[in-house]
């Protein structure tokens, strides 16, 4: 049975995010909790009252706009997934390569770590292969 999604509360949170004047300082390779909200169908949702989900910054265009990939603690295999390690965390996380997304940096809530330079290179390589397929 599908869990009911809380679009109403997410809409209120999204209004507050939009009105926020401050943006965090961030870099590529960083892993953050971001307010991804409530989404449609199989798109990855955030959780909790701030609708948070861990993400990795794969491309910084400027201080306002970035490409991200969502992460999950569930170990998944296949061409749409890749395991990475995050600094200060012994557990592996799974990058969901098929869910690349453009975000406004206002959605970034707090940094939780980094992945290695080689880790980001491998993510970009696998993502490019997925796009070219």
Q: Where in this protein do the model-derived segments appear?
A:
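C-terminal terminal-subdomain/extension
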Residues: 1-11, 49, 84-133
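Short, charged beta-turn/beta-strand-edge "cap" motif at the junction between a beta-strand
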Residues: 37-42
């Amino acid at each position: 049975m599908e869990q009911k999604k809380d679009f109403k509360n997410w809409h209120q949170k999204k209004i507050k995010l939009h009105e926020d004047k401050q943006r965090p300082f961030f870099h590529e390779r960083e892993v953050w909790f971001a307010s991804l909200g409530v989404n449609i169908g199989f798109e990855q949702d955030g959780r909790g009252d701030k609708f948070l989900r861990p993400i990795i910054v794969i491309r910084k265009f400027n201080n306002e706009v970035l490409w991200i990939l969502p992460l999950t603690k569930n170990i998944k295999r296949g061409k749409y997934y890749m395991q990475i390690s995050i600094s200060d965390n012994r557990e592996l996380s799974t990058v969901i390569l098929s869910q690349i997304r453009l975000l406004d940096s206002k959605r970034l809530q707090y940094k939780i770590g980094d992945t290695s330079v080689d880790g980001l290179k491998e993510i970009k390589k696998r993502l490019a292969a997925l796009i070219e397929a």
